Amino acid sequence: METKTVILMLSGGRDSFLAACRLLDDKNQYKIKMVTYDNGCSYGSENVSKVAKRIIEKYGFERASYLGVYRIGGIIREFFSPYFNMKPDEQVKRYKGMTPSQFHCLVCRTGMYICSIWLAMSEHASYIAEGGRKDQKFVVELPGMALERYSALVKEADLELLLPVYELNDNWERDNELLRRGYICKTMEQKCLIGFPAKDSIDQTVIDGVHAYYDEVILPRIRELHFLESDTVLCYLENKYDEFSK
């Protein structure tokens, strides 16, 4: 059977952990290449390699590998304008109820998808996957973004999006499924300082605002910068910053 290679976004948490397991146990015999992203506001990104190691030890290097931590600050900053320079009344007029926390998640997750597309091109993968769940109170994980916009973005790059745990709505069952696979449910998830889920159910105006910003600002900027073209990979795919010596 042909090996189907997947770029999997691995945060180190239990959702992306289980996503890796489900892909590897799938009848399609996926081969996964795990990657972690650091947006510049995260702690503990380097610890995620310990989670990847647990997966590799069980399934073997032929099926699973870890590409490391990639810095995506240079992608995310492209999407800050015009939001950061808008007055509150302007923000509400143009982008309805989009909160700062949902804005942060929007630009960050989009940056992850772009870098995943670059990695897929570089690693000759056909799929991109993540551990997003629709019940986690982030607009980027609701159907309008995950199933529609991000799926379309990935498809535009001639790739396919896989969401192995998207319909899972019970942490108890998630942990039990990991236990049945022989894993203790302790992980080393990185901590984002600006990622903040909605306190209650997500208001439709928040969803509409996130969709509007993506449609009107982010997607046109992605195309303007040719981020989905294969030549871009040669220029921008880097997993560290240079450092000045003393």
PLM segments and residue spans:
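Nucleotide-activated chemistry modules centered on ATP-dependent adenylation/adenylyltransferase
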Residues: 1-246
